[in-house]
Amino acid sequence: MIIMKKIGILEIVVILSILITSVSLAYKFYSNNGNDYEFDGNQMYKCAWVCEKILNKNFPLNATIIGKWTLSKKPFNGEVKIYDAKGGTLYAIYNGTPITIGGELAYQEDIAAKKIILHPIGKSIIFYELNPIEGKSFRDIANEIENTTKNFNGLNIVDVIVEGSMGVDSKTYTPVERQKIMNNLDVDIKKGLGLYFVDYGIIINGKIHLNTLKNLDNYINSSNISTSKLTIYVVVNNSIDEIPNKIKENYAIITLG
């Protein structure tokens, strides 16, 4: 009975410590209102947790990483774009190349981080759905989407993200041509964009930045494009209080905090 009582007390202490840590992290995250978040290299699980919360809300996320390359041991101090976080590992893009970031003692990841400073992009996201769009080129599709963002003139738009699928009439691509297209879109594919090559065309599925969508004509020659219903995420560097009431009454809004 005494042993069972001791185990019970230890379990309570562990549970309380987990709850206190979770509450403190949640308070820090939800009360931050868009400022930076700083972590030491021994706080990777906490850092990844915050990254997931930010990314799941569709906010773009940059970070300053201070540490070293695990292979060469050379110092690393640079800005990266984080696109995923799992366990104690961050997945990011550095100079156009995917890299992984672990804690100070990491050896499997590309970077062993001593310090991580997260920089979420934007303070609010206005999102809405668009009915299917048709066009001859990716520029046509992008222009239609961009026209809808004119409803937010006066706000500081920092990014526009498009989610949905597109059927593209083009040609049947050879293996070499397919690989070249995939190479050009490597970063977006790493972020989750799906490319499906079919006879006489391509199906594109997932999330894509509007600026990337505009440039797809450089890699894919299309004759016709038809989209599914699209979800548009307009990232603005304005707090909820700075967004006009007319917009708040007509659109759904996500805030960082």
Swiss-Prot record:
Q: Note the coiled coil stretches, chain numbering.
A: none
Could you list the residue ranges that cross the membrane?
Answer: 7-27
Listed GO cellular component terms? membrane
Main location class: membrane
How does the protein associate with the membrane? Answer: Single-pass membrane protein
Where does this protein reside within or beyond the cell? Membrane
Which InterPro entries does the UniProt entry name for this protein? Tscrpt_reg_TrmB_C (IPR021586)
Q: Keywords in UniProt for this one?
A: Membrane, Transmembrane, Transmembrane helix
Does Membrane show up as a keyword for this record? yes
Is rRNA-binding tagged as a keyword? no
Pfam families attached to this UniProt entry = Regulator_TrmB
The name on file for this protein is Uncharacterized protein MJ0418
Species of provenance: Methanocaldococcus jannaschii (strain ATCC 43067 / DSM 2661 / JAL-1 / JCM 10045 / NBRC 100440)
